[in-house]
Amino acid sequence: MSLHNILVTGGAGYIGSHLVDALVGGGYEVTVLDNLEPQVHRSGTWPSYANPKATYVRGDVRDRAAFEPLVLAADGVVHFAAAVSVGQSMYQVDRYVDVNTRGTALLLDILVNSKHNVQKVLVASSIGVYGEGAYRCATHGLVAPTIRAEEQLAAKDWEQRCPVCHEHVESIPTPEDKALYRDNIYSMTKYHQEEMVLLIGKTYGIPAVAPRFFNVYGPRQSLSNPYAGVAAIWLSRLLNQREPVVFEDGGQLRDFVSIHDVVDCLVLMLEKPGADYLPVNVGSGEVVTILDIAKMLSRLLGSSIEPKVTLTGRKFDIRHNTADITVARERLGFAPKVSLEQGFSELIEWARTTPDAAVDFFDKAMQELQDKGLLVKS
């Protein structure tokens, strides 16, 4: 397999644009298809960081007339275009299914019904397909509890319990073969995307990989999108002299991975066959509480602002999920290099030197959750 022309959908976005830089630097010809979604690109124009050596097409992955010619001109497709937010997906159901599921279906329909040269497809999946992460019960071994009941959250009983004996369980790194449980519309669409791509890939002999991203952070992350990842939301709050809001007690365990390590893994997926036809966790392998991340951001900023721990929950939130990256390590030779301290220092420096990077719309997003009844009342 020899790739030369790569199409990156959503390539003006955060992860996509960093991958475009790496591919251009590696000698690939790169075309970007992006609709410049206003929620992400507030100016409605191509971002200043867009690599000048790539070709840019403004268009939508649901528009066959725009999408098909670009697919047919490529020998590799990286499909990142998507609507991204767990909470928002619960009240913009049609939009999320239309953009994520239908957009992916159109890509696959083109591949199945047109003469093309595509030799590799990557589709962005998510930690969200797991629902809760993996757990071990002291009595019953590996267990897979589902989303916590509203009554449990209202009682501030944050930790997961064994579905058999109902005792508290221990969080362990989540492998790709863990049972999947979709507890929100966004996660359902990511599951559909990866399942469709891997199925069509296997059926028609088109090597395909579904990277399951854990909590990715780094420069170019949309700090003004209140539906983005928690680190970006907290940094935006801090830069606007407001406290980061941490749900529950802040003890939720996550895996935060630098955008640079993510891009390294994606390039390995494109260039090596070791993960073909598989979903693959993309994380750092490090475990940290979200409260520790909020405190780290404040400290690295030199701020005296303390996180606000709400001791309230959201109906769709999981408790713990961290990455077992054995598959990426063993099949691709993936080795994360960026520490949390290094990575968040870089993110902060970028945010400080980028005009209007952090406009705080968090309160608006919170009000929407409140209005839709998605916050748990204690």
Descriptions of predicted regions:
Residues 89, 162-184, 208, 212-223, ...:
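A conserved pocket-lining segment of Rossmann-fold NAD(P)-dependent short-chain dehydrogenase/reductase
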Residues 1-214:
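N-terminal Rossmann-like NAD(P)+-binding domain of SDR-like oxidoreductases, especially those catalyzing
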